[in-house]
């Protein structure tokens, strides 16, 4: 059994980790931490876990976690993991971080976007970016995984085949992305109150979203060249799900459907839909799948890729478990083969 702990278990990604790990046949959850809820039974805060998980929240103590666990997940705000991870790695405990602390390779860029110096810059080169569709073999050997963000997952999976084969102009990429309100986290915020977000639709962070440098970094790795991306996120009045509409300009003739089908044929969690399809967010609600559809309107040079994911599963907790499976020699799909919930 893989002995696992979750640091930061009161947010949406934390409870999704709990839900998925509680049903994983090869995982024992030994600790779930929260400074504010220490001593409280987890099922009191999340009644859906009653009967599945008999455990109380505890204070996060790195030494104790290292002694008890094979792997520690961080489902915390940025700035928390980088203070605790060095002590865990020193005791040979592997780490999967769902925050942004280790996603960016350049500590200067991290400081620019997150407003504070990085506390563990020496670990940035070691951290493996946890997108299995590009880093599967490195993930298997990793001590430290930087789990991708929700928008970066949907956008990168949509653009990757085009950029890997250098088929489009990398200076003219557009990502028009929409997310449900759970992407903003569980904290109380005016903009995600029902009366504010319900029956409303708006763009935000148009001048620069924190996921932008992460997306650009990944696309540049894929294209092996500089990339210029216009990224506009939107908040839509639903709880969970991401829909990204991606635009690129073709520079070389190619059978787009065949390109995508061949690229993702071996991937258990990327589904390339038939020509003319329009993926829906409800088709991935509660599961670890990314569904893609490729369009070329009027047979012109503009390629449009539609990408949908569940921001809490493939965009966070499910992908984290996918990484864990690879790290510990499990079947990659173990504990993740859930059918999406409709309606």
UniProtKB/Swiss-Prot annotation:
Protein's cellular compartments: Cytoplasm
Catalytic residues (positions): 150
Transmembrane segments: none
UniProt keyword list: Amino-acid biosynthesis, Arginine biosynthesis, Cytoplasm, NADP, Oxidoreductase
GO cellular component: cytoplasm
Enzyme Commission number(s) from the entry: 1.2.1.38
Major subcellular location class: cytoplasm
Reactions catalysed according to its record: N-acetyl-L-glutamate 5-semialdehyde + phosphate + NADP(+) = N-acetyl-L-glutamyl 5-phosphate + NADPH + H(+)
Biological processes annotated in GO: L-arginine biosynthetic process
GO molecular function, one term: NADP+ binding
Superkingdom to which the source organism belongs: Bacteria
Pathway where this protein functions: Amino-acid biosynthesis; L-arginine biosynthesis; N(2)-acetyl-L-ornithine from L-glutamate: step 3/4
Pfam families the record matches: Semialdhyde_dh, Semialdhyde_dhC_1
Database matches in HAMAP family: ArgC_type1
Reported function: Catalyzes the NADPH-dependent reduction of N-acetyl-5-glutamyl phosphate to yield N-acetyl-L-glutamate 5-semialdehyde.
Family the entry assigns: Belongs to the NAGSA dehydrogenase family. Type 1 subfamily.
Record's protein name: N-acetyl-gamma-glutamyl-phosphate reductase
